[in-house]
Design a protein with these regions (language model features):
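Nuclease catalytic cores that cleave nucleic-acid phosphodiester bonds
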Residues: 3-6, 14-134
């Protein structure tokens, strides 16, 4: 494997995994998710993913206009978000690729391309660990 690991986050799936009213403001919920990822490039997601890390948040639908910020590239899918994530995995075969989703079909598609898959709880647990350590 070459280069910086690539963390690909399924925004719709991760946002939708927590019943916190996201459906009232999908762009806002997606921006909040993006902001929780700001420290991943420099901190990683211990212990599984040490830094540095490239982070790509894949968005679609009502969240398409959420902008990128330094450290988190937001990719608005031209077609389906799942297809965009598979294309990202396929485009970087020499890198370690981690996809965050609970979507079973997407999990199968990206693992067939050699990616690792983690569920939304993995990211939420990271945030909980970070808050408890500060």
């Amino acid at each position: 494997m070459d280069g910086t690991p690539l963390l690909i986050v399924d925004a719709a799936n991760v946002v939708g995994s927590r019943p916190d009213g996201w459906w009232r403001d999908r762009p806002g919920a997606t921006a909040r998710l993006r902001d929780t990822l700001l420290t991943v490039p420099s901190d990683g997601v211990p212990p599984e993913l040490p830094p540095p890390v490239e982070v790509v948040l894949v968005v679609e639908g009502a969240a398409r206009d959420v902008p990128s910020v330094p450290g988190v590239r937001v990719l608005a899918a031209d077609h389906s978000g799942d297809d965009a994530m598979v294309e990202l995995v396929e485009a970087h075969p020499q890198r370690r690729r981690l996809v965050v989703t609970a979507d079973r079909e997407l999990r199968e598609r990206v693992t067939a391309q050699g990616a690792e898959v983690y569920g939304p709880r993995w990211l939420r647990d990271r945030d909980t660990r970070r808050r408890e350590s500060h």
